[in-house]
Amino acid sequence: MSKKVVTFGEIMLRLATPNYLRFIQATEFEATYGGGEANVAVSLANYGLSPQFVTRLPKNDIGSAALSTLRKHNVGTDHIAYGGDRLGIYFLESGAVTRGSKVVYDRANSALADIQPGMIDWDKALDGAEWFHWTGITPAVSQGAADVCLEGVKAANAKGVTVSCDLNYRKNLWKYGKQPGDIMPELVAGCDVILGNEEDAEKVFDIHPEGVDVTKGHVEAAAYESVCTQLMEKFPRAKKAIITLRGSISASHNSWSGVLYDGKKLYEAPTYQITHIVDRVGGGDSFMGGLIYGLLTYSDDDQQALNFAVAASCLKHTIKGDFNMVSVEEVEKLMGGDASGRVSR
């Protein structure tokens, strides 16, 4: 039986401008679905695990379409709550070269934003699970979402389920009177695995890497050991801290890597040059999906788990949409050094 992983968050309607058009130019939008924790669940399903996505959906046709999307990708939906008036939306303007991408959120009063404690039966949702994952996006949406997320973390801790979080700082979401420093520490205190990047660590916990300037297009992996150490000192339950390393040469060209620290040793993944980004949205989620799979599959090999996560995420940058539609075999092929992109016949 494949391993059960539970993720909690919001799946949204994604409305993206086609062909790199700006919002002001667009007369139509490409409609798909996605959201941080849902994206992780889809990755895990593609890798043969048994993910369950926990959320709250409205009882209308848009909610049904989101539900159908999850099921189409073999994501379990057994513990979803239903109610509320609407599904959250985000609008995406894809950047190119020197123009960065833009996201506009329309998530106020969504079904997930209006969720309240007691709406999710966490005991049932986490029954038989080996892993529970959430991101810093969810508690940024509303106090209710933060409270329910904390319910999930505490229930997972009580059951001995491994808990991971992606800090995922989003400045445009914290609008209900609380700041990350008010909410995140209690949530992250229950985590065994913490993922972030240099901005997350700084904005959420005022943790600063040394000797790093991402605007120069180069990041030094060793400089992040201090970030990992500080995270693990602040949150002693954590057994691993992981930092994604993105060097932004332009909106179309990034370098991509990551480091993992287990409290004793710093592991560094190979660096990939992604010279023609198709869609970077979901890049961090694909990393997390790869990392969870890697840590569950290569339980005694953190280096292999990290390498899998970075390679999986590298491939995601070539795929349109939120979801990372790749297989284990494709990721392992890239890990093995085949980055040719040649036609497979």
Where on the chain are the PLM-derived regions?
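Alpha-helix C-terminal capping segments
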Residues: 32, 40-51, 92, 294-298
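Conserved post-catalytic alpha-helical subdomain immediately downstream of the catalytic base
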Residues: 267-338, 345
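Positively charged, low-complexity intrinsically disordered leader regions
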Residues: 1-22
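A short helix->loop->beta-strand "cap" motif at the edges of active sites that frequently abuts
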Residues: 157-162, 235-239
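Conserved phosphate/ATP/ADP-binding segment of small-molecule kinases
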Residues: 173-263
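Hydrophobic beta-strand scaffold residues
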Residues: 51, 77, 163-164, 195
